[in-house]
Each structure stands twice: as structure tokens, then as C-alpha cells.
Amino acid sequence: MFLVNSFLKGGGGGGGGGGGLGGGLGNVLGGLISGAGGGGGGGGGGGGGGGGGGGGTAMRILGGVISAISEAAAQYNPEPPPPRTHYSNIEANESEEVRQFRRLFAQLAGDDMEVSATELMNILNKVVTRHPDLKTDGFGIDTCRSMVAVMDSDTTGKLGFEEFKYLWNNIKRWQAIYKQFDTDRSGTICSSELPGAFEAAGFHLNEHLYNMIIRRYSDESGNMDFDNFISCLVRLDAMFRAFKSLDKDGTGQIQVNIQEWLQLTMYS
């Protein structure tokens, strides 16, 4: 067993699936995302060099990373995604907006009533084409696989209705934040705009973590486009929620074995 200290510090809380859905679904979802309310890793160690020097360097690097992330989890109070429910279990008090979303989800998800990574990629890319002010290379299949994985609470490899709704609501909110903090209207978030955007999303990180994120998700000039911004926040939200679920006594520390650690980190 080994100890993993607190992760970060913050809180957090797709476009038509191909020709069969036609432009109507894309138009409706594009409208939904436009109507969003405003506001809103790290280095492993090196090998063991002569006389133990390499091992000492490795431990210092790892210790620095853990120290950087250990200040964060205490203030994170996410609302977990609602439990999965069968599509037919529609509550009488659902709003018309939720009922409409269920109908759209049914069209998108198909007979299995789940959204795959490919279906998610199609819907997100159809929506972002309606927003030329968002600079993006498009959502790739690997990005969407990662997004599905971190939201996939029952490890089916797909998103059920509640999982997809939770993801979609976050994307709407984060899109509004992205536009708000793109102050120079470049279509990207630059390194100086990033802290404000992340704090508006509820993630209060230290400088070391911001630098790590910029190196991982931004281009060589330090600019982060929309798909990388969303991908990063989806991952942060999922990591925070996973940590909180394991930190049952609220100490800011969790203890996991190697199998639990691999399960947590590899399927994401």
C-alpha cells in the first residue's frame, strides 16, 4: 500500500451523431450550448544512478509533484453525477427541458441508449462548427475516449443518460467561461487568461500545476484551444471526484494498492 496525497484544489460542479440525425439535432444542441449560463501530470521519477544519486533525484521530483498537488482536495465539494436510471424511468416532475433532452439523447444514443466515444465525437464536432469564435482542431477520438472513460461510472465503455447529461451541462458551463476569459477574442485561452478561467470553473491551482497543465494541454505559445480546455477540465473534475470518493474521512490523504491505483489512472 502507498499513500497518495491530496490532488488539487477546486470544484466543478455533443452535435449530431451522423447523417441519420440530420441538421435538426445539431441545431437544437447548438442552441442548448449557446444558452449556457456565464460565469463561471506530472513528472515521475528517474532511474537509480550510481551511489543512489538517481534514486534521490527521483524522490525529490516525485516529492515536489506530490507537494504541489497536496494542497488542493480539501475545498473541493463536487456534486456527483446522478445514478444511472433506465430511460423508461422518467419521473413525472421532470421539466420540459429535461424531457426534451431525453428525446434528443434517445435519437443520439440509438437502440442501446448509451453514447459511445465515436457518437460523442460526432455530436461535439457538429456543435463546435456552429461557433466560429471557438478555436479548435476538433474533438479527436482519443480525446473523446478519455472523456467517456472518466465519466463512465459503471465501466461499460459508454455513457448513459445521466452520465451524458452531467457531462453536457459541464461543457455548457465551461464554454461560457471559455468565452468570458478569452478577453482578446483570439478564440483561445492564453497562459495569462488560464488561471482566471480555471478559478471561475471552481479549480484553484498553484503555479506549478498551472505550468504542468500548460505544458500538457497548450500549444508551444502557451495558448489552449477549446477542445483541449474542455478535455482538461473534464479530467480535473473526474480526478477530484475520484479522490473525494476515496477520501472518506476527509483527511486529504488516500491509501490505495497498486491494482486500485492502476484502475484509477489507466482507464481515463
Curated annotation (Swiss-Prot):
A single Gene Ontology MF term assigned here is:
calcium ion binding
Q: Which UniProt keywords apply?
A: Acetylation, Calcium, Cell membrane, Cytoplasm, Membrane, Metal-binding, Phosphoprotein, Repeat
Q: Which SUPFAM superfamilies match?
A: EF-hand (SSF47473)
- Residues the record lists as binding Ca(2+) 3: D182, D184, S186, T188, E193
- Which residues hold Ca(2+) 1? A109, D112, E114, E119
Indicate the segments forming the EF-hand domain, all copies: 91-125, 139-172, 169-204, 205-233, 234-268
Superkingdom as given in the UniProt entry: Eukaryota
Binding locations of Ca(2+) 4: D137, D225
PTM Phosphoserine: at which residues? S6
- Binding annotation for Ca(2+) 2: D152, D154, T156, K158, E163
A Gene Ontology term for the protein's cellular component: calpain complex
Q: Tell me where in or outside the cell this protein is found.
A: Cytoplasm; Cell membrane
Sites of the modification N-acetylmethionine? M1
Function according to Swiss-Prot or TrEMBL: Regulatory subunit of the calcium-regulated non-lysosomal thiol-protease which catalyzes limited proteolysis of substrates involved in cytoskeletal remodeling and signal transduction. Essential for embryonic development.
- Subunit (UniProt): Homodimer or heterodimer of a large (catalytic) and a small (regulatory) subunit. In presence of calcium, the heterodimer dissociates.
Q: Which PANTHER family match?
A: CALPAIN SMALL SUBUNIT 1, CALPAIN, SMALL SUBUNIT 1 A-RELATED
About its domains, the entry says: The contact of the 5th EF-hand domain from each monomer allows the formation of the homodimer and also appears to mediate the contact between the large catalytic subunit and small regulatory subunit for the formation of the heterodimer. EF-hand domains are paired. EF-hand 1 is paired with EF-hand 2 and EF-hand 3 is paired with EF-hand 4. The fifth EF-hand domain, left unpaired, does not bind the calcium but is responsible of the dimerization by EF-embrace. The first four EF-hand domains bind calcium, however it is not sure if the binding of EF-hand 4 to calcium is physiologically relevant.
Q: What disease is this protein tied to?
A: Pulmonary hypertension, primary, 6: A form of primary pulmonary hypertension, a disease defined by plexiform lesions of proliferating endothelial cells in pulmonary arterioles. The lesions lead to elevated pulmonary arterial pression, right ventricular failure, and death. Primary pulmonary hypertension exhibits incomplete penetrance, sex bias and variable age of onset, both within and between families. PPH6 is an autosomal recessive form.
Question: What name does the UniProt record give this protein?
Answer: Calpain small subunit 1
Q: Which organism is it from?
A: Homo sapiens (Human)
This chain is encoded by the gene named CAPNS1
